[in-house]
């Protein structure tokens, strides 16, 4: 998890920091991805099973096979829930290990940081960045479970839709390219405003800590109390300004997501209806396609509403690195390894 600044090299990007942090968890993440793929495949049992049941019922052929199909669909939903619990368990294990490693790394690095690197800094205030580990923990559940499943569900839904009619391939490509374009369009601005928001948050906390450290001087002194409130009000205003700037960008993500969902849903519904009328699709396929459209639309919504969490995690990784990027005293470092 340590990130040493290397002379002549640019600092790692937030995504690079996050991947390095999760590098030791690769085997566990592979299992999470495997579970997500299985869950995604099982989720397809709903539209495909619905199509099969609809075809049987519409022809008046209600046999035991119909009940078997219903049981398969219900069983798929149950199995998907069990796999979700497995994913959550694996993510919880990753979160606990990240917390433990961060705590040990901070405890190891703090006494070994070069004194000149701390000039003008309050080490106690810098340590507050450790609490962003909690933000990373909470965000990983969304990233490794919700976001991953939403992405896989969109990909699988698009692939299945393409089998119903070649036109749906175009809709699928439009969806994937649209999502990538929407994400990249405001990425830099969203990340910058998120980091600015976090900086003001820590500045406010640092001021409150300063006040807490000199309560005897502040208490009962009208001038000091006014100064305390005025500075807190100023920092709060700056934080809210930065937060509003960040939220405006998030709203643009939500708006693009709504527009993408609307265009996709309208296009697929109109195309599907025309294909049924022209007998290029059966009614059962149309019903299954509608279920897939709802699933894809829901996944797009989940991705857009999770965008805030993505930037929170990237910002948190940057803030944790404020301490881990500080250069260490090589002499103390070598002594520690010699004594180990």
Show the residue positions of the predicted features.
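An intracellular "coupling" helix at the cytosolic face of ABC transporter transmembrane type-1 domains
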Residues: 26-27, 115-118, 128-140, 144, ...
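Cytoplasmic coupling helices
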Residues: 80, 89-111, 115, 172-216, ...
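Transmembrane-helix motif of ABC transporter permease domains
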Residues: 26-46, 55-100, 119, 171, ...
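Membrane-embedded alpha-helical segments of multi-pass transporters/permeases
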Residues: 44, 48, 81-85, 158, ...
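Membrane-integrated ABC transporters
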Residues: 1-45, 59, 63-68, 87, ...
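Primarily ABC-family ATPase nucleotide-binding module
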Residues: 130, 225, 322-340
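Hydrophobic alpha-helical transmembrane segments of ABC transporter permease domains
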Residues: 42-46, 54, 129-174, 260-264, ...
């Amino acid at each position: 998890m340590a990130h040493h600044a290397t002379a002549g090299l640019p600092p790692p990007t937030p995504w690079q920091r996050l991947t390095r942090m999760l590098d030791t968890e690769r085997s566990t993440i592979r299992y999470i991805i495997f579970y997500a793929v299985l869950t995604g495949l099982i989720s397809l049992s709903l539209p495909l099973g619905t199509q099969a049941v609809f075809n049987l019922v519409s022809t008046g052929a209600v046999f035991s096979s119909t009940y078997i199909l219903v049981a398969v669909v219900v069983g798929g939903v149950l199995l998907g829930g069990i796999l979700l619990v497995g994913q959550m368990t694996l993510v919880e294990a990753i979160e606990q290990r990240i917390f433990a490693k961060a705590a040990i790394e901070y405890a190891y690095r703090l006494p070994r940081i070069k004194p000149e690197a701390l000039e003008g800094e309050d080490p106690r205030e810098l340590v507050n960045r450790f609490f962003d580990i909690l933000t990373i923990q909470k965000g990983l559940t969304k990233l490794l479970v919700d976001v991953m499943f939403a992405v896989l569900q969109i990909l699988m839904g698009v692939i299945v839709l393409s089998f119903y009619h070649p036109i749906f391939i175009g809709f699928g490509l439009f969806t994937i390219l649209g999502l990538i374009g929407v994400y990249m369009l405001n990425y830099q601005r969203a990340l910058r405003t998120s980091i600015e928001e976090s900086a003001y948050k820590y500045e406010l906390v640092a001021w409150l800590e300063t006040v807490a450290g000199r309560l005897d001087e502040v208490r009962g002194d009208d001038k000091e109390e006014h100064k305390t409130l005025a500075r807190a009000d100023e920092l709060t205003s700056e934080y809210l300004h930065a937060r509003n700037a960040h939220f405006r960008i998030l709203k643009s993500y939500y708006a693009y997501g709504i527009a993408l969902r609307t265009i996709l849903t309208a296009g697929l519904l109109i195309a599907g209806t025309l294909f049924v009328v022209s007998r290029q699709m059966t009614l059962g396929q149309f019903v299954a396609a509608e279920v897939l459209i709802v699933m894809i639309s829901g996944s797009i919504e989940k991705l857009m509403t999770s965008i805030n969490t993505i930037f929170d995690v990237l910002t948190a990784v940057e803030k944790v690195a404020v301490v881990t990027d500080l250069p260490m005293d090589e002499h103390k470092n070598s002594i520690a390894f010699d004594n180990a």
